[in-house]
């Protein structure tokens, strides 16, 4: 991604799963988010030693990293350690209710310990990791923490308590394919999102066989994309733009044979596939000219945004340019991006999903 000598990348590692988000009662919550704040403070205190300017920091993240960036935007540290943000495929959060912590306590036989938290901490981390993976425990952030998260994102934006900084936000066309390859039962798949039977039936009717084919894989993929990524991204982008925040939105819709995986066929522009283009780490073997061109264009836009607080010519702010204000990276018309309307990609969001989803 480093295409200019003035760009200094700083990549941080934070705790995840139970190590970062244990959700244990009466303990500090969202430790992983606290790690990120500490890392930003370190950058603020030390980036000058590397030739950087602490007043010109742009933060960006993808997937759970995009969600982390969203929460930093919603409840910013003081003093503000960044001046711009990029959210790639920021996922809507299913906030933890502590259920997985209780399961882990039982699985580790710590339920009768005087301190369940200390009992779990005393167990080797590799053992804990194996238990989590074997039992598919998902330790996610909690919105009950008033230090690093907000519960009502809409109120935060409209009340101007978020960071007042420009942002790039977007998602991929086929976000769901990587997560739904084994789906054969749509009812069962939707139950993980906690929708009741009546709502599940309505959702399934929105993704008919006539439009998506008979494969549960492709129908579930489209559902997952809209539930977790596409529609929350659309809602958040419009919310920020309507409240005076410079917002630039993209859709990544490019796929290349040398980035495909055999374990989820017809993956398309799958979750995280844009990272290869942004960092320039795509497989050079089999790379085609338009793949190389797209990588250069996306890297240039990202770097321009970090330097100038706008991506540059050809990518207008959301809410301008007569409605053609979303840049489509890929697709059929241009290998390096062209402008489309939100209505062309958000149809199901505005006609159906907005009643069930939120920006949080």
Model-derived regions, located:
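Active-site rim elements
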Residues: 27-30, 90-93, 106, 154, ...
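Alpha/beta-hydrolase fold catalytic core
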Residues: 196-242, 247-249, 254
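Short glycine/proline-rich turn/loop motifs
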Residues: 18-24, 203-219, 278-285
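C-terminal, loop-rich substrate-recognition/catalytic regions characterized by aromatic stacking residues
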Residues: 162-206, 346-359
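Serine-hydrolase-like catalytic core of hydrolytic proteins
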Residues: 1-117, 156-179, 293, 307-313
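Substrate-access "cap/lid" subdomains that shape
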Residues: 79, 84-190, 220-225, 230-242
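A structural signal for well-ordered alpha-helical segments within the folded catalytic domains
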Residues: 34-41, 67, 99, 137, ...
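Mobile gating loops/cap/lid regions near enzyme active sites that modulate substrate access
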Residues: 234, 238-360
């Amino acid at each position: 991604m480093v295409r200019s000598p003035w760009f200094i990348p700083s990549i941080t590692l934070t705790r995840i799963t139970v190590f970062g988000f244990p959700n244990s009662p009466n303990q500090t919550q969202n430790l992983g988010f606290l790690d990120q704040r500490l890392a930003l403070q370190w950058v603020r205190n030390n980036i000058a030693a590397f030739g950087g300017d602490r007043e010109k920091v742009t933060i960006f993240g993808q997937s759970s990293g995009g969600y982390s960036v969203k929460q930093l935007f919603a409840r910013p540290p003081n003093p503000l350690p960044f001046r711009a943000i990029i959210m790639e495929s920021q996922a809507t959060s299913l906030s933890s209710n502590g259920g997985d912590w209780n399961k882990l306590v039982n699985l580790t036989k710590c339920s009768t310990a005087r301190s369940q938290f200390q009992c779990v901490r005393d167990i080797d981390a590799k053992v804990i990791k194996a238990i989590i993976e074997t039992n598919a425990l998902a330790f996610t952030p909690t919105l009950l923490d008033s230090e690093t998260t907000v519960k009502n994102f809409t109120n935060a934006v409209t009340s101007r308590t978020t960071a007042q900084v420009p942002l790039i936000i977007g998602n991929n066309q086929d976000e769901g394919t990587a997560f739904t390859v084994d789906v054969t039962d749509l009812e069962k798949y939707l139950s993980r999102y906690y929708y009741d039977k009546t709502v599940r039936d309505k959702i399934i009717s929105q993704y008919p066989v006539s439009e998506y084919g008979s494969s549960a894989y492709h129908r579930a993929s489209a559902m997952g994309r809209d539930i977790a990524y596409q529609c929350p991204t659309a809602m958040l982008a419009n919310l920020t733009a309507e409240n005076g925040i410079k917002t630039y939105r993209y859709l990544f819709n490019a796929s290349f044979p040398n980035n495909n995986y055999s374990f989820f066929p017809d993956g398309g522009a799958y979750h995280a596939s844009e990272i290869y283009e942004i960092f320039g780490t795509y497989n050079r073997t089999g790379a085609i000219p338009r793949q190389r061109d797209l990588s250069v264009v996306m890297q240039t836009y990202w770097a321009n945004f970090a330097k100038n607080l706008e991506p540059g010519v050809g990518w207008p702010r959301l809410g301008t340019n007569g409605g053609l204000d979303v840049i489509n990276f890929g697709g059929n018309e241009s290998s390096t991006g062209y402008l489309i309307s939100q209505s062309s990609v958000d149809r199901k969001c505005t006609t159906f999903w907005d009643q069930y989803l939120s920006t949080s």
